[in-house]
Structure formats: structure tokens, C-alpha cells
Amino acid sequence: MKKLSSALLVAALSVAMVLPVFAAPSPQATAKPSVAVTTTTTKAAPTAAEAKATEAKANATVAVAGADVKVLPVAVMDAVEDVVENTTHLKNLGVSSAAKLAAAFDLKIEIPAGQTSVSVPIKVNNAKVGDYAVILHRRADGQWEKVGEGFLGADMTVTGTFTSFSPVAIMVVDAAQASAAGVKAPKTGEF
């Protein structure tokens, strides 16, 4: 009798264990797309108060005499983040890997008639004397270029020579890291 009850118990438990599998919904097979799909993440548009606070922060970060300085749209800010967070891009531009983004803004100034470029001194308010600043400019073709660099003096300015105006990113290397990171003085080539 023990053997019979054991066999019935084993059979009942075996059936009981299998039944939930039949009750579960069948997994859906997903078809692979025939073309590559690129996805992008989008950021929510800032509220009016956030936009005003961001613009005030940008104006407090840099000062450009006689220029129109505006906060960058989200899509352009994403492009700024892509270049400043990619060490290969920075290396190709001749920017130290120790550089940190200090400011990003859209710069508009009229280039005087008959001139192909204009030098613009930019005051960097969120750095300190002795820090090394680099000005990056996004050209119309979407590529970034270095348009100015130098150690910040008492006036806290670095000058860039622009042939066109559009998004600008200011990268700063802390004074203590400048020589350790291999930052050379642009005119003398010295560390």
C-alpha cells in the first residue's frame, strides 16, 4: 500500500508541477527589423522658470562685451556634451583630458565689413587665476574647432578668433593640473 500511495503522490505532484506552465501565456516572438533602427533620447523642454534660471546662470558664467550670449537649445547642448565627454575628440582638438566644461552658450557678434575674422575676449567667471582655458567653437558643418586658449590672468579672460558665430564651449583645466596634464603655453610651448 505504501508503494501505491507513493506512486500516486509522485504522479499527482508531477502533474501539479507541469500545469502552471500550460497556464502561462506563450512568449511572443519578436521579429528582427530588416533595417537598423537608431534611437535617441529626448529631454523634456524646460519650463519658463527653468529657462530663465539657466540663461541667468549662463550670463553669470561668461561675459562677452558687445555680444549676444544665449542659452543653447537642448539638441545643441547634447552635441556639446558629446564632444566634451569624448576623450578622442578632445585629443584631436588638442584639449587636455583634464579639462572640464565651464560654460556652453550661443555667441552672436557682427563681423565688421571687410574682415574675415574677429578676436573676442571672453571673461570666464567660474574659474580662477592660473587656470588654463580653451575655447571650442562648433562650425556650421557641425565639426568643432579650437579658436582660442590661454592661462587666465587677473582679468579672467581668454581670447578666441572667430570666423563665424554659433555654439561655443569653454573648457578649463585647473591650475594645479595644468602642468601635470601636459598643457603647454600656446606662445612659448613651455609647460
Question: What is each residue range found by the language model?
Answer:
Residues 132-143, 167-171:
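Short beta-strand segments and strand-loop junctions that repeat across beta-rich extracellular domains
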Residues 159-182:
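C-terminal beta-strand-rich structural cap/linker in extracellular carbohydrate-active enzymes
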Residues 6, 15-31, 183-191:
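Sec-dependent signal peptide cleavage junction
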Residues 50-113:
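Self-processing/autoproteolytic domain segments and adjacent N-terminal interaction modules in large
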Residues 23-64:
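Low-complexity, acidic Ser/Thr/Pro-rich repeat tracts that form intrinsically disordered stalk/linker regions
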Residues 26-29, 90-134, 139:
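Proteolytic processing hotspots in large secreted/extracellular or virion-associated proteins
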Residues 1-11:
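Positively charged n-region of N-terminal signal peptides that target proteins for export
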Residues 107, 146-154:
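Solvent-exposed serine/threonine-rich low-complexity stretches and specific carbohydrate-binding patches
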